[in-house]
Amino acid sequence: MNLDSTALAYQSGFGNEFSSEALPGALPVGQNSPQKAPYGLYAELLSGTAFTMARSEARRTWLYRITPSAKHPPFRRLERQIAGAELDAPTPNRLRWDPLALPEQPTDFLDGLLRMAANAPGDKPAGVSIYQYLANRSMERCFYDADGELLLVPQLGRLRLCTELGALQVEPLEIAVIPRGMKFRVELLDGEARGYIAENHGAPLRLPDLGPIGSNGLANPRDFLTPVARYEDSRQPLQLVQKYLGELWACELDHSPLDVVAWHGNNVPYKYDLRRFNTIGTVSFDHPDPSIFTVLTSPTSVPGLANIDFVIFPPRWMVAENTFRPPWFHRNLMNEFMGLIQGAYDAKAGGFVPGGASLHSCMSAHGPDAESCDKAIAADLKPHRIDQTMAFMFETSQVLRPSRAALETPALQNDYDACWASLVSTFNPQRR
């Protein structure tokens, strides 16, 4: 499909009750489901949470569309499925990958998905599946994910995400979130694209509580952007693909499913520029817990325990006195999947490059490599700015099982443990 070059418009805020109409008066006034909707549209509700959730937790959007979503033939299971569907046995070993190679054959967003790891089947209301995407052509079909909410983290190439509620344009250093069940199409603006995805099977992502930080800081609500209504009135045949319990199913439509003329609600897609994150850090000593870098979180029923946290390590000043400044050596209850969008990560002098990834599972010891450690111990502790960098982490409370495909890819580094092998004992009981 041809890309529409019309400049995109957005609405600002997080968790708002938004409304938008592409034609004047398309939104009903004072009710959701009138006997006759304006312009001959059909009213349809998209529920992102159960009806009886607390009002503060409820997610739903009313859509006013040209053709109801219910008008479709039976779905058929596709022969080509997502790579990495088969999970391997759990491993406590630390894993790291080089950037995955971009495809040589024409590959759209769906065909270029590789599941890296997961910790829950799609029929459970908790857990996360982690993917990388590799593409070199725009989608000519539409897709929705019945298994979870999608958090997209581009690393290479700009994307235009054409959704039922409007279009989002995202580039590396921005993220996008698409609600469970929302139909969309991915168009490539730069020819090739690579990035990461967290498929959240649990509670919808929200901003973390700030506690003693106060009422401002980290990701500020006004910097999240939601699209305005934008519809396609096309009667050309089109394939609609859905992901259902981990498998791809498809049917053929006689119209575009991106035909929503007006809508209102809070179950919406959105984007966020990571460069607007208000980074918090120490101005005295020690390295605070990395939870201070949390952008979004999906909570569990246990207070403070996340189903998934999305954490970034952005450009920042390091000023701590008498302190080992890199992230410390660590054994964590949580499971950490990391990626790198640009630059270098301050705990790894080499081997972890943009487009790469790593997985440190529950209680797997990790921390700065030997070179980074030696430099930090000997460093002159002047104020130092870590610049031109953006690493991130998907942190989850359930153990991640890598996929068989992720363990068999040539990008897997078989010598990852070697980065700590040259750490030597400097213990001297005679000298404090």
From Swiss-Prot:
* Record-linked NCBIfam families: hmgA
Similarity comment: Belongs to the homogentisate dioxygenase family.
The pathway where this protein functions is: Amino-acid degradation; L-phenylalanine degradation; acetoacetate and fumarate from L-phenylalanine: step 4/6
Natural source organism = Pseudomonas aeruginosa (strain LESB58)
Query: Which named protein is this?
Result: Homogentisate 1,2-dioxygenase
Q: Which reaction does it catalyse?
A: homogentisate + O2 = 4-maleylacetoacetate + H(+)
Functional description taken from the UniProt entry:
Involved in the catabolism of homogentisate (2,5-dihydroxyphenylacetate or 2,5-OH-PhAc), a central intermediate in the degradation of phenylalanine and tyrosine. Catalyzes the oxidative ring cleavage of the aromatic ring of homogentisate to yield maleylacetoacetate.
Any Pfam family hit: HgmA_N
The UniProt annotation places Fe cation binding at 330, 336, 366
Q: Where is the active site?
A: 287
Q: Which UniProt keywords apply?
A: Dioxygenase, Iron, Metal-binding, Oxidoreductase, Phenylalanine catabolism, Tyrosine catabolism
Report one GO cellular component.
cytoplasm
Which biological process annotations from GO are given for this protein?
Answer: L-phenylalanine catabolic process; tyrosine catabolic process
Cofactors that this protein relies on = Fe cation
The yes or no answer to whether the keyword Oxidoreductase is present is yes
Recorded GO MF terms: homogentisate 1,2-dioxygenase activity; iron ion binding
